A protein has these predicted regions:
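Residue(s) in the substrate-gating loop at a strand-loop-helix junction
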Residues: 144
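Substrate-binding pocket helix/loop in short-chain dehydrogenase/reductase
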Residues: 99-101, 105-110, 208
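Active-site helix of classical SDR
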Residues: 124, 160, 168
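Alpha-helical segment proximal to the catalytic Tyr-Lys
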Residues: 129, 173-177, 236
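Short C-terminal tail/terminal secondary-structure segment
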Residues: 98, 149, 228, 239-255
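A conserved structural motif in NAD(P)-dependent oxidoreductases
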Residues: 212-223, 234
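Conserved glycine-rich cofactor-binding loop
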Residues: 9, 16-17, 40
Length: 255
């Protein structure tokens, strides 16, 4: 029963597709009540429909991570529906720029940092106090192995994800004394719509598959299970950490 989430309420941003959808589905399968959120309500409702078809419980709430008021509404809607929030998964992110840093415009970089870093801090400050009052909670940020390496294509995105890892360590120091576990997941290249520009590029995909110990890129469910671990009793002593789930790219020694 170490992975049982029965009675827990999980809020997942970017939950309508890819990694976020898998996290929603896997947490529901392990007993959690799930609040599925992304910008587009119909896409969230489709995920909810699938969860309910398998006997799970979920609701859909549209929210953009770029808008603090919408995130406040998301948190309020979750509390109204289920009374509390036990698990917060910050999966939503944006990467509007693919190319060298020489072509990166300042406003685009600011948007990346606001969406990918500041929104996570907003959410922690929204849900942290109630978790602290109960002395129980799991706060998970989906980062990326891009946080650990340089890139000629998505450097701005990588910088934001590196900032998330630093944020996790600091939040863990602030909130850990209240038994709130703050952790990150760093996925490798996952076959999602978000990463389509990477895995549809034969050279980039081939390089990743060659470097990976498992010789493949990842699938969304490869990450969903990691999130369940961090949210459950199985991860009760894990705090301030980043779990790398990349098929063995980082640390493989491949050049």
């Amino acid at each position: 029963m170490m992975f049982d989430l029965t009675g827990k309420v999980a809020v997942v941003t970017g939950g309508s597709r890819g990694i976020g959808r898998s996290i929603c589905e896997q947490m529901a399968a392990h007993g959690a009540k799930v609040v599925v959120s992304s910008r587009k309500l119909p896409a969230c409702e489709e995920v909810v429909k699938g969860i309910k078809a398998k006997g799970g419980e979920a609701i859909a709430v549209a929210a953009s991570i770029s808008d603090r008021a919408q995130l406040e509404n998301l948190v309020a809607a979750a509390r109204k529906a289920y009374g509390q929030i036990d698990i917060m998964v910050c999966n939503a992110a944006s990467n509007p720029y693919f190319g060298p840093l020489t072509g990166l415009k300042e406003d685009v970089f600011q948007k990346i940092m606001m969406n990918n870093v500041m929104s996570n801090l907003w959410l922690m400050n929204m849900v942290g106090p109630e978790m602290a009052e109960r002395r129980d909670g799991a706060f998970i940020i989906v980062s990326s192995i891009g946080a650990l390496v340089g890139s000629a294509h998505i450097a701005a995105y990588n910088m934001s994800k590196a900032a998330d890892l630093s944020l996790v360590k600091s939040l863990a120091m602030e909130w850990g004394k209240h038994n709130i576990r703050v952790n990150a997941i760093a996925p490798g290249l996952i076959q999602t719509d978000f990463a389509r520009a990477l895995w549809e590029n034969p050279q980039i995909r081939g390089a990743q598959e060659s470097k990976a110990a498992l010789k493949r890129i990842g699938q969304p469910d490869d990450i969903g299970g990691v999130a369940v671990f961090l949210a459950s009793k199985a991860g009760a002593f894990v705090c301030g950490q980043c779990i790398i789930a990349d098929g063995g790219v980082i640390g493989s020694g491949a050049e």
